[in-house]
């Protein structure tokens, strides 16, 4: 997978030189490139922003540097993703969708964002990290790149490493425990020490359902629930409201 980031601050992305994303680069599973679109400004001072037509607060990123930077990229069938608080909210399903692509381009905005013509003519995806506003798109891009890259084949070693992650099943993930079994009087649930895999799977599913009901009940509206799941949720729904 080729990933290109258009940004005014490429130095911010050194965080991706660590951990899983770094390993994916070392193993040639992804290629990460950063383009400072200020380099494409035709303004002799390297200016990339101007005041908006019609007035209003803030400055807007001009279309010319973005259009020229995109035109300079190698020809490819690509997703061009604008990071914007007005976009679709990023989620695990979108990360999974992107992980099947071969070429992603992230546009990191600043100030009041991009001239609308960038969105109309270049962008395939307008995506937001959440219902809040960041200073720029860089942190959002790093988050989305990490979430996408870890889903690529063999990046985590085996598929099971992410198949039970929160949101991958439509639910929040169940609690995890490791040694020691008793830490300062805080004990691991007995079922996890039982060796009974069927009981363990049931416990994990129920814990995921309970956690989702308590913390993100909105996810249950679209989760793939069995009749057993529904009965369990019904049995605890009164408790979760107490």
UniProtKB/Swiss-Prot annotation:
GO biological process: tRNA N1-guanine methylation
Coiled coil (UniProt feature): none
Cellular compartments annotated: Cytoplasm
InterPro entries referenced in this protein's UniProt entry, alphabetically: Alpha/beta_knot_MTases, tRNA_m1G_MeTrfase_C_sf, tRNA_m1G_MeTrfase_TrmD, tRNA_m1G_MTases_N, tRNA_MeTrfase_TRMD/TRM10
Entry EC no(s): 2.1.1.228
Gene Ontology CC: one annotated term: cytosol
Reaction equations catalysed: guanosine(37) in tRNA + S-adenosyl-L-methionine = N(1)-methylguanosine(37) in tRNA + S-adenosyl-L-homocysteine + H(+)
MF GO annotations: tRNA (guanine(37)-N1)-methyltransferase activity
Binding site for S-adenosyl-L-methionine: 109, 129-134
SUPFAM superfamilies documented for this protein: alpha/beta knot
Enzyme class label: transferase
Keywords assigned by UniProt, alphabetized: Cytoplasm, Methyltransferase, S-adenosyl-L-methionine, Transferase, tRNA processing
Protein purpose: Specifically methylates guanosine-37 in various tRNAs.
Family: Belongs to the RNA methyltransferase TrmD family.
Subunit description: Homodimer.
Protein name: tRNA (guanine-N(1)-)-methyltransferase
């Amino acid at each position: 997978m080729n990933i290109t980031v258009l940004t005014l601050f490429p130095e911010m992305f050194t965080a991706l030189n660590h951990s899983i994303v770094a390993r994916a680069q070392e193993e040639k599973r992804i290629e990460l490139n950063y383009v400072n679109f200020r380099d494409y400004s035709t303004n002799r001072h390297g200016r990339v922003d101007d005041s908006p037509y019609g007035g209003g607060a803030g400055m807007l990123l001009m279309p010319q540097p973005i259009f020229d930077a995109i035109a300079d990229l190698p020809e490819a069938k690509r997703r061009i993703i604008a990071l914007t608080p007005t976009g679709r909210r990023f989620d695990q399903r979108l990360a999974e969708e992107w992980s099947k692509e071969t070429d992603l381009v992230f546009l990191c905005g600043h100030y009041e964002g991009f001239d609308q013509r960038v969105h109309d003519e270049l962008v395939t995806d307008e995506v937001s990290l959440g219902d809040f506003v960041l200073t720029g798109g860089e942190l959002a891009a790093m988050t989305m790149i990490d979430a996408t890259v870890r889903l690529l084949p063999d990046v985590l070693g085996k598929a099971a490493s992410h198949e039970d992650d929160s949101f991958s099943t439509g639910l929040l993930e169940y609690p995890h425990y490791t040694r020691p079994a008793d830490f300062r009087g805080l004990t691991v649930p007995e079922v996890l020490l039982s060796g009974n895999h069927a009981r363990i799977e049931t416990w994990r599913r129920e814990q995921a359902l309970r956690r989702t009901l308590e913390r993100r009940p909105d996810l249950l509206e679209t989760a793939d629930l069995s009749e057993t799941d529904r009965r369990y949720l019904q049995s605890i729904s009164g408790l979760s409201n107490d």
